Amino acid sequence: MAGKARVHELAKELGVTSKEVLNKLAEQGEYVKSASSTVEAPVARRLRDAFPKSGGKKGGGDSNGRAGGAKPAPPRPPESSGRTEAQAPKPGPKPGPRTETPSGERPKPGPKPGPKPGPKAPAPETKPFEEAPAPAAKADAPAQPRSEQPRSEQPRSEQPRSEQPRSERSGPKPGGPKPGPKPGPKPGPRGGGDADAGVVPPKPQSPKPGPRSPRVGNNPFGVGSGAPAQRPPRPGPGGGQRQGGQGPGRGGPQGGRPDRQGGGGQGAGTAPAGGDRAPRGEGGGGGNRPNPGMMPPRPNPGMMPSRPARSGGGPGGGRGGGRGGPGGGGGGRPGGGGGGGRPGGGGGGFRGGGGPGAGAGTGAPAGGGFRGRPGGGGRPGGPGGRGGAAGAFGRPGGPARRGRKSKRQKRQEYMDNMQAPSVGGVRLPRGNGESVRLRRGASLTDFAEKINANPASLVQAMFHLGEMVTATQSVSDEILELLGSEMNYKVEMVSPEDEDRELLESFDISFGDPGSSDEELMSRPPVVTVMGHVDHGKTRLLDTIRKANVQAGEAGGITQHIGAYQVITELEGNERPITFIDTPGHEAFTAMRARGAKSTDIAVLVVAADDGVMPQTVEALNHAQAAGVPIVVAVNKIDVEGANPAKVRQQLTEYNLVAEEYGGETMFVDISARQGTNIESLLEAILLTADATLDLRANPSMEAQGVAIEAHLDRGRGPVATVLVQRGTLRVGDSVVAGNAFGRVRRMINEHDEDVTEALPSRPVQVIGFTSVPGAGDTFLVVDEDRVARQIADRRGARIREAQNAAKRKRVSLEDLDKVLKETNQLNLIIKGDNSGTVEALEESLTKIEVGEEVELRVIHRGVGGINESDINLATAENTIVLGFNVRAEGKAAEVANREGVEIRYYSVIYRAIEDIEQALKGMLKPEYEEVELGRAEVREVFKSSKVGTIAGCMVTDGIMRRNAKARLLRDNVVISENLTVTSLKRFKDDATEVRDGFECGLTLSYSDIKVDDIIETYEMREKPRA
């Protein structure tokens, strides 16, 4: 075999299955992956040497209990084609050839098992290729000359064949078989007639017992024998070596042609009509005496069957009986029963398991099959199913057929495909109004996982909908809702609170009281938030209560931070603590006021008696009412000239705050924070309201939970967060997580700058130990270990970034694409502040500035702490302005900024920063121009010049005509041409820069169709100052 041999080629050559070759190679320590793999020449040589030993054992013995008179024939020399010939028969599937049984065992007398075929009995050698047997020319000629001559000498066959003497093989005929005139087994001169090398004793249930009852051939590959589908002969031992070798299938009407499925064989069965019966002594009738013209065609791969052969044994006894008569049984390999005919046949054996063949029209009690399993049988009466051939060309049992779809199934699939939405040719899943919950900033991959779809299909669908997004890109809520509506899904965006709750539940953590008993609950101080308009005296009121002066330390006299304090007051002789939270009143601190209202028990609304209700007063009132907290109104500045407390009561009545003296439930207290008037009455009103309307109890034994009111970056202490404990007790050493910041409590400081070791409910403290600055308003909670805190913080940070990316991405449709592509001026900012609440308020206020679509503001970075070198480096790369709010440049940052030309602006009052940025944005606007008319001239004459073109002789009737000015041409008060230019202007023969009204001039325009009496109007574009 030239080159490297493949496993299935070696299996053909050795006459075994590919599985056995693979097993043998594994035993030899060679790893081969599959039947199509190649093996090296030394490995193939060892494989060939190994198989005769094992094959001789299997093939030489008489596995079916036959007489051992047959001797193995000597091995054949290699044929002229150079193909190596294996020295062993097929090891597993075919036991030794049947030797002839004594004549006494047969129902038919005669020297059938004559001694002649004895020496030429089955040769236990296999041939590389098993060809279709040639028809026997003369059935009574001895087979001795044929076994000595290699098959390669014959012109119609390429492979050498070892011959076996034909044993008698007769199939009972339905019409009464006649015994052949030559009962003795006389081998024919041609190997093709060796179809019956072994004798099978007839079954007792044969319908024609006695001397006239022939035996059924034993061909495991006969149609209907329970063997695998018939196929053309493979390389291997010739028909003379096999039990019932291959002979011409010539039963019945097909007596003269070989069988197309498996090659005909002179089998036992004969057709009731058709060709002449062969003598009984020749092993069954197969037609006329064989002759060379009946040789089958040479085997080739094209003869492989494309589908399993039909059941029903052929009249021949070869590897496959043809489509023979009703009782014909195909001869098989050693050990196999005869293939049953159409009425019923025995099972064909594959590996020595088949019982004796059945007679015509009867089922075989023991069928062959794969490895001796029951199988075989004809179409109507066969006892079992087909066997199977294992090897490189298929799995055992034949190819599995896939059932055809029913019409109902096809119709249902068609209807499903018709109802499935198709966007741009992409099939999408159909949702029947189902709800899909997605988090903020989700990607198309997240959406596809929810609906079990392909993300690439959603990307393609979005492209056809005019949206260009990737599968992993965070997309906005409206894009997800648009895509969901196309597929009939209802997209629900998870709120940040629900998303955070689901995140905590994944760690078996719940935020809130898990349900403490009454014994565990203890009373706590009320948390009071002071709210109101700017400059109405909120901080002065707290200073008076605390007997401190905080207002003097605030820039501009306005509060720009949230301050938290706890004071002790007396009520009915008992000292009662009250926690106060001071919120900014400036309009920029809306978010701070909202956070203060959410984390409070009672809201104190401070209104100046001289100013009355102001816009921030209404806003603070709305925050308190939205949070559902009771309100106590403090009418301040009653000592100021022009104060009118009654007016304040009347105005607040419009906002559902009715004073008690007017029959309402809201307590009004007239105070003077500067003079300290009625402060005790205000504190008493706060405590009475808390006792009357609130159940102020908390469980101090649980793990601490609360809210971060504000946070900042301290230069010496790092991130510092002011937290308000709402439940539980916070202790030094606890692992805490607040928003996307986490850490371990290293130190806690109260409002008097004193260290404390624990903080009970309603106690505000400053916590040191966070790894980063938490966001103002973030909830904090204590967890078991740092690892859990880090994981929660990381997931929160990733969620926040995705939501920000989705919000930044503006939805751009194809109609708005031209606007997007226009060049716009952009002002980049870096904001650094002293605490997170101030930075948030400043950024929110700056982004609300609107000066036009041509200029936009972009905050590329924000942070808490001083301005450092990394901020300057980022500003250098992005051409950015750095804003420092209550902070300064650290270290060499100022020096680097001067060297790189980065502008740093420092602010301490928020509204000044807002004004400066608004002016800067207006300065970046493109100038606006307006048209200003210069003059008009009437065309009196038109001259043609080959050098300069058309010359208009004009009289200036109004204004001036100026060279290089813009002009338009009017004819009968209709604009003929626009955007023209006065290219030349002359007064007589002299060039002129301008010509005033009342003078004549000659001019040329960038337009040649000028006629007499046309009007030339000149104008110029002047920049229009912005309001």
From Swiss-Prot:
The keyword GTP-binding applies. Residues 523-695 form the tr-type G domain. Residues 557-561 are annotated as: G2. This is Translation initiation factor IF-2. Residues 57-68, 237-268, 311-397 have a biased composition (Gly residues). One of its GO terms (cellular component) is cytosol. One of its GO terms (molecular function) is translation initiation factor activity. InterPro entries: EF-G-like_DII, IF2_II, IF2_N, P-loop_NTPase, Small_GTP-bd, T_Tr_GTP-bd_dom, TF_IF2_bacterial-like, TIF_IF2. Residues 582-585 are annotated as: G3. Residues 401-410 have a biased composition (Basic residues). The keyword Protein biosynthesis applies. Keywords: Cytoplasm, GTP-binding, Initiation factor, Nucleotide-binding, Protein biosynthesis. Residues 110-122, 174-188, 201-212, 293-302 have a biased composition (Pro residues). It holds the Pfam family IF2_N. It comes from Saccharopolyspora erythraea (strain ATCC 11635 / DSM 40517 / JCM 4748 / NBRC 13426 / NCIMB 8594 / NRRL 2338). Belongs to the TRAFAC class translation factor GTPase superfamily. Classic translation factor GTPase family. IF-2 subfamily.
